[in-house]
Every structure is written in C-alpha cells, then in structure tokens.
Design a protein with these regions (language model features):
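C-terminal non-catalytic regions of proteins with extracellular/luminal or membrane-system context
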Residues: 2-169
C-alpha cells in the first residue's frame, strides 16, 4: 500500500473549537501499518512511477477549516492534482478525505475505488478509519449534515456579499 498526501504522516485537525491537542496521536501511516501488518509506504509527494507500481494507493487529503476563515469549496490545487495523478497512474485508488466540511470531488469521484470521508479523526480515529479500509468493520450511520456535490447545492450559494475575493470553484 502506498499512502500519499500531506496528511499521510500526521493527524489533521482544524482550528478554533476543533483544535484539540491529544495524546498518543495515531497517524494514517501508523494506523494502516497496525491494521495491515504488511508493507505500507508513506510518501507525501510521490511521483507517477511510484503511484503506478503500487498495489493500492491511498491519498490522504482534505482541507483546513476554522471559525472565521472562508475557504473555497475546492481542495488545494496541489492536493487536487495529486488525486488526479493517482487516478491516471493506478486503478486502485482510495481517497481518504480528512476535513471539517464539504469539498468538491466532482473531477475524480467516479475515477476512484473508494472515498472515505474521515472528517477530523481526533487522536485515535485513524485506527478506526484503517479498520474500515481493510474491511475489519463496516461503517454505518447517518450524518447530521449534508455534503454538497457542488457549491451551487449549498444553502449559502449566492449569499456571499459582493466585493469579497472568495472563489467557490
């Protein structure tokens, strides 16, 4: 398994009220190593050949969210490019989204094997996420929120005051 992305070796969290420094944090890399007990290689910025040669690629991506920060609905351009490159290089791609809110996945959602929306997992949530990835547990439940397919589906669409330099593409 090739684990890639800026959050392959760290536990992401948002700012403001969602910023809680835990103890004994479990990273995506540590969680997958524990769940698989097999060869897991973590590379933040892989090249095309590394992606192509991997049996399975897991892209750990997402956004940074906090109160009083307006961010685009899109992922960071570098993260978006990594997902697209992984899809071009390999047929077995899992995208692990670690975020505090929705993102635009329309450019690649139909090109990946799976999407796991892990939100901000907390200090040990990555272990449960890894158990989902390896089939140890079957996730179920209902969300208290809606993840929009595009920003136009958001109740906030069209309500941003004129003059603000915010992109929602």
């Amino acid at each position: 398994v090739l684990l890639v992305g800026r959050w392959a070796k760290t536990v992401p969290q948002g700012g403001g009220a969602s910023c809680v420094r835990g103890f004994n944090l479990v990273t995506p890399e540590q969680a997958l190593l524990s769940a698989l007990r097999a060869n897991v290689k973590a590379v933040e910025k892989p090249n095309f050949i590394q992606l192509q040669k991997a049996d399975i690629v897991v892209v750990a991506t997402g956004t940074y969210d906090s109160e009083n920060i307006e961010r685009p609905f899109a992922m960071d351009e570098e993260d978006e490019a990594l997902v697209r490159m992984a899809c071009a290089a390999n047929k077995k791609v899992i995208v692990l989204v670690l975020s505090g809110s929705g993102i635009d996945m329309s450019a690649w959602h139909d090109k990946v094997s799976a999407i796991i929306y892990g939100w901000y997992p907390g200090q040990a949530g990555m272990q449960a996420t890894a158990d989902i990835m390896v089939g140890k547990i079957n996730p179920s439940g209902k969300l208290p929120a809606t993840i929009e397919k595009s920003f136009k589906d958001s109740p906030a669409y069209g309500m941003i005051p004129a003059g603000l330099n915010i992109s929602h593409t």
